[in-house]
A protein has these predicted regions:
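Immediate flanking context of iron-sulfur cluster ligation sites
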Residues: 2-5, 33, 44
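Compositionally biased, disordered extreme N-termini, encompassing classical targeting presequences
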Residues: 1-2, 30, 76-86
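Conserved helix-turn-beta segment immediately C-terminal to the redox Cys motif
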Residues: 19-32
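Local sequence-structure signature of Cys/Sec-based thiol-disulfide redox active-site neighborhoods
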Residues: 1-19
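Thiol-based oxidoreductase modules, predominantly thioredoxin-like and allied folds used
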Residues: 29-41
């Protein structure tokens, strides 16, 4: 599973990355987190406000920091599609 954090490196972007890393660790999910700071790449996802979280190339949230439970739900949705598990 590939999780991308889109943003300029601002405090909210760093917070989203930290929260996402924490959720992954607690869930025990095999995932890679990538930071995307290039504005053209960010706009390529249709994101106009950061931070944003993209899981397996699907934008899940942008313009805010989702809570841990919300991030967990996004990961579970994609894990089910990818591996057939929750």
């Amino acid at each position: 599973m590939i999780i991308k954090i889109l943003g300029s490196g601002c405090a909210n972007c760093k917070r989203l990355q930290a929260v996402t890393e924490e959720v992954i660790k607690v869930m025990g999910v095999d995932a890679t987190i990538e930071k995307v700071e290039d504005i053209k790449m960010i706009m390529g996802y249709g994101v106009m406000r950061t931070p944003a979280i993209v899981i397996n190339e699907k934008v899940k949230a942008f313009g805010r920091i989702p809570g841990k439970d919300e991030i967990k739900k996004y990961i579970q949705e994609e894990a089910k599609k990818e591996w057939g598990v929750v």
